Each structure stands twice: as structure tokens, then as C-alpha cells.
Amino acid sequence: MNKILLFAIGLAIFSSCTENKKSIIAFASDNPAERVVWERIRLADPATGQIPNNIRKKEMIFAKTLPKSTVISKANWKHRGPYNVGGRTRALAMDVQDENILFAGGASGGMFRSTDGGLSWAMTTSPNQLHNVTCVAQDTRIGHEDTWYFGSGELTGSSASGGEAYYGGNGIYKSVDGGLSWDSLAVTATNTNGFDSNFDFIWNVKTDPSNDSLDVVYAAVYSAIYRSENGGNSWTKVLGGGSAYYTNVEVTSTGVVYATLSSDGTDKGIWRSLDGQNWTNITDSLFTPVYGRIAIGVNPGDEDEVYFLAAETDGYGQHTDVFFNGETWTSLWKYNANTTAWNDISLNIPANQNSSFDNFNAQ
């Protein structure tokens, strides 16, 4: 009897260990990269190995031809989500004509417009357009306020393609009806699924409010700065062209242009131009030698005072501990255009708070 009991106990222990081992194997860590490859194989044309161009638009057109069921009534259904498909909000703007009209663009969710100060929102990008908005700008000149531009293409990862994977765009979109509808600027769009144009990834777009004779627009794209004099119908590269991953551009009310290119590019640094075509590198000799994206802020009360916030400045600037046991370095500098003087004010960046979630973490 004792032998039978011991055998039963041993069998139970062995079974328990086996089950635990199976559980560990069953819940192995995910691999987002393999998921992307798997999904691409499922979507690609077997003959070419590529995802057909404009296939989503064709799919939507075909769906309209399918027979509709009369059994299920719309009254039987209630929308239960998901509601959080906008992704990271990369673009935000207020209409200069009406402060209650707001625009918000998601890195993987499209462009949304509000007419009541943000109490309610309506998507203004159409289903057959790419929904990866990264920046938005209004033409603030008198008589041109209904003209808007937004750039597409997310290089730092989005919910549509995985946390570390980029989400390619399709150029710049333009609206001439106050943001109610958007049309692609054909010269910036390739309508392909691959990375084959600088305009596939746009960091920022700005208009020149000082020029009444030309419709001047600037675009900070992958590795370069482009300029248009006809509202985006044609473009000229005015700065860069190397391998800078991050770029940015800002324009003052008088038409002075500032641009930045990350340290991995050949034309790296902080640049200034009086006409948008001839540029001077104004980077201070003590500025951090390593930097990624640089945000630009012009003081509206004194446009000769410009701030530059640089991320990923390893070993320089302010060190902060961030969530998930991470750490980061960020540098903040102030430039005076009158005196050409630079001040390192990185110590003003919040750090060493009670929680790592309270520390500053640039994107």
C-alpha cells in the first residue's frame, strides 16, 4: 500500500514539473520583428514578393461590391472600441482664425479636427490615405488661413508597425478648405510601400508668414531640408543630403529660418538662414558632439532668442533616470541672434525626481 502511495505522489510531482515546463515554453517572449515578416508574407503578391501598390484602396472599392445582409440591423450594434487607435500624437495646432478649431495628428491614427475646443473630434483624412501624421502647419498670412499642410512618415516607431519599427509615409498633404479635406502633393508622393524617397519620412513642415508674393513652404525630411515657392507643387533641396536621421526646421515671423540636422549626418549641426537658401552653421563650439533630434523654439516676444533642445546627447547636458530602469541625456541651449551668444541651460531640465516617471524624457 505504501509503495502504491509513494508511486502516486512521485507521478503527481513529475506531472506538475512537466506542466510547468510546458507553460514556460508556451509563453516564450514575443518577437515583433518576426510578426512583421510573417504579416508581410501573407500580404505580398506571391508572383512578385511585394505588397501591391494602392491595394488598400482597391480592397475598399471591391468591398462595396459585396452583397449586403439584410438580416442584421444597424440598430442591433453599439460601438465598443477600440478608441485608442490614434497612436502617439505628433502634430497639434490651433487655427489662428478661431481658437476653438484644433488639429491633432496621430503617428498611426490620421488627422483629427475639433471645432469646439477639443470637446469632440472628427477624422478628416479619408480611409484610403495613410494615417501616419507627424507634423502640421497653417499658412497664417491674411487671406491664406484656410491652407494647411501635414507631413507623414514616422521614423521612431509606431503602434502600426511595432514599437521600434518605422512607419513609412507618402509625402505631404495639403488642405485648402480649412482642414476639412486633404489632397496629396503629387511631387512628394511615390505611392509605394518601400523607402524610396526622402519625403517618405517628414519631421516637420513650416510656412513663411513674411512672404506675400510667394507661397513658401519648408519641409524637414529624412537627411535634408527642402523649400517650395509655390505651395508644395515643386521643391528644392536647400540643406543636407547626407545621412542625418533627424532634421527640423522653424521660421520666424520675419522669414528667418533655423534648421537642425542630427550628428550622424554630413551637414550636422544648427543652421540659420535669412532667405531660406543661403545657410550659416551657427553651432557653438561647446555644443554636445553627439545628438539626435533637436526641437526648436523661437521666443514669440523676442524672436532673436531661440531655444534648442537636443535629445540623445550621451554624456552631455542633463542626465535623467527614466522608466523601465533606463537613462537618458538631454541638452538645452539658448541662442541670441543679436549677439550670437550661446548659453547652456541644460541644468534647468527636470531630473532626480521622486519617481523616474517624473523625470524629463525627450522623444
Residue positions per predicted region:
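Sec-dependent N-terminal signal peptides
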Residues: 4-13
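Extracellular glycan-interacting surfaces
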Residues: 17-363
